[in-house]
């Protein structure tokens, strides 16, 4: 560790992983280790596209040279998989979890990630606000909150945890919660039950300008969120 009381960790998105060369990576690693000191990185395997295996292998080899721990990451956003997906209401391209091709894609992502890493984190896009015809049909008479809480528990078990641990029984899976706690239930985040099925939990700790950015996050929010989740899963 470079610091006494905390680790420094960074997250590398799939598109960047696919395009950076080994020479560029070593140049950036030299700079970061000189001026910051990185203990660990999360290598994203999917965000709209898969990170290529040869790129992941290159990253892991280079990071080993620098003594940097490496884990995987997944961001659950995807482009339209067919023409019918254009009708779906998918904020930030998040998945529709009632759509079979998208469910199959998520299962494939989980299996691929578990085959590459013994630990991975699910970034804080693991939610749904889709109200397409498929979602309305499956929701039935339940409220959107009831439906989404149940749906995301099912997705967690059957499309992420189950498939990943079948490929790699020792894989450690972390769910990262976003910083907008007031909307958890409406979007399917379930901190009451998900910590029982995931191996670890984490939460976003970023802050932004209080008046000029889209989420209006106050400076003290990171502290309150960490305290909240310490109580959820002590």
Q: Model segments located where?
A:
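Short, acidic/polar
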Residues: 17-35, 99-113, 183-194, 222-226
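Substrate-binding cleft/loops of secretory-pathway carbohydrate-active enzymes
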Residues: 86-87, 163-225
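Acidic (Asp/Glu)-rich catalytic clusters
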Residues: 1-3, 28-36, 50, 54-67, ...
């Amino acid at each position: 560790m470079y610091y006494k009381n905390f680790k420094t960790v960074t997250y590398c998105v799939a598109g960047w992983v696919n395009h950076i060369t080994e020479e560029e990576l070593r140049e950036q690693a030299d700079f970061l280790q000189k001026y910051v000191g990185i203990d660990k990185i999360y290598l994203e395997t999917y965000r709209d596209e898969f990170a290529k295996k040869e790129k992941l292998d290159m990253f892991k080899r280079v990071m080993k040279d620098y003594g940097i721990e490496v884990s995987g990451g997944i961001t659950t956003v995807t482009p339209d998989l067919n023409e019918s997906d254009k009708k779906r209401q998918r904020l930030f391209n998040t998945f529709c979890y009632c759509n079979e091709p998208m469910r199959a894609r998520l299962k494939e992502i989980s299996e691929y990630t578990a085959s590459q890493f013994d630990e991975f984190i699910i970034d804080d896009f693991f939610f749904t606000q889709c109200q397409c015809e498929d979602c309305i049909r499956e929701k039935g008479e339940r409220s959107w909150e009831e439906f989404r809480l149940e749906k995301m528990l099912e997705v967690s078990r059957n499309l992420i945890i189950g498939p990943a641990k079948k490929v790699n029984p020792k894989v450690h899976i972390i769910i990262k919660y976003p910083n907008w706690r007031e909307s958890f239930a409406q979007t399917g985040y379930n901190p009451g039950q998900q910590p029982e099925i995931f191996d670890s939990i984490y939460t976003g700790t970023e802050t932004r300008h209080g008046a000029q950015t889209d989420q209006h996050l106050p400076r003290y929010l990171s502290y309150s969120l960490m305290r909240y989740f310490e109580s959820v899963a002590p």
